[in-house]
């Protein structure tokens, strides 16, 4: 069941081979009100726990947002290997893998600030869009630099920066007329 309003409907529930996983197909209705909805998980007809599901308010003008065309030149960036604009975030106490430039598959320290610092360079190349490999948290003990084993779909990996710094990067890219692709991999995670 869902609590919090009539804006979200459960279409189907899929049980996985493992009892640790459950997949839920939902339909977010066109008139769904922004807010927090709750999936209510029950056992033997009695509620066991609730899981929050937030629907944010649509940003003004988001429907008119320009898309990408064949005329765009997209510059692909692997942030960890691009530029280190803030060495203080190369290793954090909250993440498993620490920066080690001597390891080929280790983290090398590139970050969002490094991208911001080089937006003029990207613009001068003639790029019209930036596509960063995933910047969301990838808290694997090894090989986490590429970001393709996301462990938190809501937060930028602290070794890259913060959600606020990501928004700043996008705003500064837009000021230069650069579009930004946010790469997110949802079919496998860490």
Regions found by a protein language model. Name each.
Residues 1-45:
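Immunoglobulin-like IPT/TIG beta-sandwich domains and homologous Ig-like subdomains
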Residues 45-159, 163-178, 188-189:
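N-terminal structural segment of carbohydrate-active enzymes
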Residues 185:
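A short, small-residue-rich loop immediately preceding and capping a beta-strand
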